[in-house]
């Protein structure tokens, strides 16, 4: 039975960047309801990834981390740095809320969806991933789920690492965390990553002429943080990071025209916070500022030529969160304020625009005997579409010790992006997309196996579609998504197993046709063990059939893309207590497959890396 005492002592909103690296049921998570709580008390399906997991998997991108998680389907227009989309439980890529240290990712404000191919893996210390509706807690976008990437680290000392691999991949990273007296801690990081890449596009799918070239990626990152404890209950922090990325890609091309095939992204973020961590009352105030400049251009003409485009956005955020422990649970409440400003020309919108949103929310969690109840409600006041309300509720019943039934219902929404509102084909009268979701689940511990099986349904209305006849965007689409998700983890002797299965039937509710680019079935399996000081890991992933569009000729044709089984092999060896070497083979059997029609994947890839700590 879940211990109430652990909930009472753990509930807190002291930080979105929880430092716990343990993945046990009592690991503290903050993303589900904006306050710290043991993961076992979260009724929504929750997954936590630590930096140790990322190092063990030897992931070189955020997408490689997320693709391993239940309910996640990643599609990408090629290799490193290429445009990618995250589908959670069959919902649109724009229906995933991505947070960085609890603050909305700025880049998603331009396109309406988060492209994590550009976010440096070096910054990721922890990922908290929640499936299901969370608009009642966070507002817009949280229809399919929430991904909270946490950059705060708790690794005193210095680490130097380097890696090399296929397609001329190289990576160099230096980080340090030092204590300045008893109450102050400083963290610094610098990272450089580069790959020559490969030709990502199959011939004939980018216009009248093929582009046989390497499509590489370059990323340079800096990070700094200062944390200070003023007293036993008051603390504060200042944090900033920035990255400078360049991506070469294949684009639609006709002879005689500039070939816009290079992306240059500058992004910087700054935030500061003050926290009060009392015995019964917790509170935090966080302010943040982020600025991104996203160029697409022909390198022969430069970023400032008339053929180039610039998407520039500034985002200002203020969050005030509070939590009070009451009985065997707590009540949380807070206010979010956000302003997004775009420069003229962003997202093909001639004028610059400001969009402001103020949200107030209330959350609650209470344990009564063998029952756990959870609820949340939120009201958003948006400068474009006015006021919108969402709510959710869940109940868990531990009917036998170690076994629990969970039922939940929630509403959520997605606000239209700036291009849909104000672009050349925009419609300023668009309403938010709306969702209603139901889920039922059983979970338990049987013979050493931690397992969970859930079924869900998601009805999405007022989907924003483009009308070919009126050349405008309208709220005229509907989607119906049904799915089953099963997860389990267990040990057999020295072997650790983690497995998940997803079945997703995502359809257009009007035409009854499958939604594009979603795999109908996925199987994911991770096997880890240690032998003679070598740490071994095998990753298996089955991607089922999916549908896409062939845009090489008009009218566009729907194509069916077959399933594929992928294997990765990773090994690490601690040469000394300070030096560790690692090696990995991705796509071990060199399978040829695509997740976006016409865009090739990398095939078999090798990486070799080492890290030295002191």
Curated annotation (Swiss-Prot):
Where is the signal peptide, in residue numbers? 1-20
GO MF terms listed in the record are:
ABC-type vitamin B12 transporter activity; metal ion binding; porin activity
Where in the numbering of this chain does the TBDR beta-barrel domain appear? Answer: 155-614
The record's PROSITE patterns line, in alphabetical order, gives:
TONB_DEPENDENT_REC_1 (PS00430), TONB_DEPENDENT_REC_2 (PS01156), TONB_DEPENDENT_REC_3 (PS52016)
Where would you find this protein in the cell?
Answer: Cell outer membrane
Single Gene Ontology BP annotation: monoatomic ion transport
List positions binding cyanocob(III)alamin. Answer: 83, 85, 92, 110-111, 251, 309, 517, 551
| Motif TonB box: where in chain | 26-33
Q: Which residues bind Ca(2+) 2?
A: 213, 215, 249-250, 261
Which SUPFAM superfamilies is this protein grouped with? Porins
Q: Which residues form the TBDR plug domain?
A: 38-152
- Membrane topology term: Multi-pass membrane protein
One Gene Ontology cellular component annotation? pore complex
Pfam families under this entry?
A: Plug (PF07715), TonB_dep_Rec_b-barrel (PF00593)
- Please indicate if the UniProt record lists tRNA-binding as a keyword: no
Question: Which positions does UniProt annotate for Ca(2+) 1 binding?
Answer: 199, 211, 213, 215, 250
Motif TonB C-terminal box, chain ranges: 597-614
Where is it chiefly localized? membrane
Q: What does the UniProt keyword field contain? A: Calcium, Cell outer membrane, Ion transport, Membrane, Metal-binding, Porin, Signal, TonB box, Transmembrane, Transmembrane beta strand, Transport
Membrane-spanning segments: 158-165, 169-178, 184-195, 217-227, 232-248, 263-277, 279-296, 309-325, 328-337, 353-369, 371-381, 385-400, 403-417, 434-443, 449-458, 473-490, 494-509, 517-529, 535-550, 558-572, 585-596, 602-614
Q: Do you know which PANTHER family this protein is assigned to?
A: COLICIN I RECEPTOR-RELATED, TONB-DEPENDENT OUTER MEMBRANE RECEPTOR
Q: Which family does it belong to?
A: Belongs to the TonB-dependent receptor family. BtuB (TC 1.B.14.3.1) subfamily.
**Function in brief:** Involved in the active translocation of vitamin B12 (cyanocobalamin) across the outer membrane to the periplasmic space. It derives its energy for transport by interacting with the trans-periplasmic membrane protein TonB.
Q: What is this protein called?
A: Vitamin B12 transporter BtuB
Tell me what organism the protein belongs to. Answer: Escherichia coli O6:K15:H31 (strain 536 / UPEC)
């Amino acid at each position: 039975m879940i211990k109430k005492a652990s909930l009472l002592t753990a509930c807190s909103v002291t930080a979105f960047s929880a430092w716990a690296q343990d993945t046990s049921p009592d690991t503290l998570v903050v993303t589900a309801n904006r306050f710290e709580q043991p993961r076992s008390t979260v009724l929504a399906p929750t997954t936590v990834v630590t930096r140790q997991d990322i190092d063990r998997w030897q992931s070189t991108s955020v997408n490689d981390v997320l693709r391993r998680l239940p309910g996640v389907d990643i599609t990408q227009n090629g290799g490193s740095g290429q445009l990618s989309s995250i589908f959670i439980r069959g919902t649109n890529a724009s229906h995933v809320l991505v947070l960085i240290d609890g603050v909305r990712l700025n880049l998603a404000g331009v396109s309406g969806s988060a492209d994590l191919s550009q976010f440096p893996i070096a910054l990721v210390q922890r990922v908290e991933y929640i499936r299901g509706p969370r608009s009642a807690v966070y507002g817009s976008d949280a229809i399919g789920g929430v991904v909270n990437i946490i950059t705060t680290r708790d690794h005193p000392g210095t680490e130097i690492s380097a890696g090399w691999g296929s397609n001329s991949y190289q990576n160099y990273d230096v980080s340090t965390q030092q204590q300045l007296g008893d109450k102050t801690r400083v963290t610094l990081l610098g990272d450089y990553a580069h790959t020559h890449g490969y030709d990502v596009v199959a011939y004939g799918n980018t216009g009248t002429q093929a582009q046989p070239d390497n499509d590489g990626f370059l990323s340079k990152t800096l990070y700094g943080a200062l944390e200070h404890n003023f007293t036993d209950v008051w603390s504060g922090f200042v944090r900033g990071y920035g990255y400078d990325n360049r991506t070469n890609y294949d684009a639609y091309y006709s002879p005689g025209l500039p070939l816009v095939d290079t992306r240059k992204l500058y992004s910087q973020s700054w935030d500061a916070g003050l926290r009060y961590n009392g015995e019964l009352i917790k509170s935090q105030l966080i302010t943040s500022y982020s600025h991104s400049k996203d160029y697409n251009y022909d390198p022969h003409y430069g970023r400032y030529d008339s053929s180039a485009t610039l998407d520039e956005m500034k985002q200002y955020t203020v969050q005030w969160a509070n939590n009070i422990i009451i009985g065997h649970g707590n009540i949380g409440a807070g206010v979010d304020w956000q302003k997004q400003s775009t420069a003229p020309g962003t997202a093909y919108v001639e004028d610059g625009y400001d969009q402001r949103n103020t949200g107030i929310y209330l959350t609650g969690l209470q344990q009564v005997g063998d029952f756990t109840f959870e609820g949340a409600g939120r009201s958003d006041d948006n400068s474009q579409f006015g006021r919108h309300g969402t709510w959710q509720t869940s109940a868990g019943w531990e009917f036998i010790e170690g076994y629990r039934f969970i039922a939940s219902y929630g509403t959520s929404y997605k606000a239209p992006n700036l291009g849909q509102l104000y672009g050349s084909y925009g419609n300023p009268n668009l309403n938010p997309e709306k969702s209603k979701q139901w889920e039922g689940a059983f979970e338990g511990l049987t013979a050493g196996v931690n397992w969970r099986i859930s079924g869900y349904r998601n009805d999405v209305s007022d989907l924003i579609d483009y009308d070919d006849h009126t050349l405008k965007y309208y709220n005229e689409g509907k989607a119906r998504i049904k799915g089953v998700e099963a997860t389990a983890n267990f040990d057999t002797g020295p072997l650790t197993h983690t497995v998940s299965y997803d079945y997703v039937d995502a359809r257009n509710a009007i035409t009854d046709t499958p939604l594009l680019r979603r795999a109908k079935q996925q199987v994911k399996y991770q096997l880890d063990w240690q032998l003679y000081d070598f740490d071994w890991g095998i990753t298996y992933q089955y991607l089922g059939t999916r549908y896409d569009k062939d845009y090489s000729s008009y009218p566009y044709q729907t194509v069916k893309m077959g399933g594929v089984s992928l294997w990765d092999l990773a090994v690490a060896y601690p040469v000394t207590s300070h030096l560790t070497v690692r090696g990995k083979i991705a796509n071990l059997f060199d399978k040829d497959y695509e997740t976006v029609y016409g865009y090739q994947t990398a095939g078999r890839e090798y990486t070799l890396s080492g890290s030295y700590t002191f």
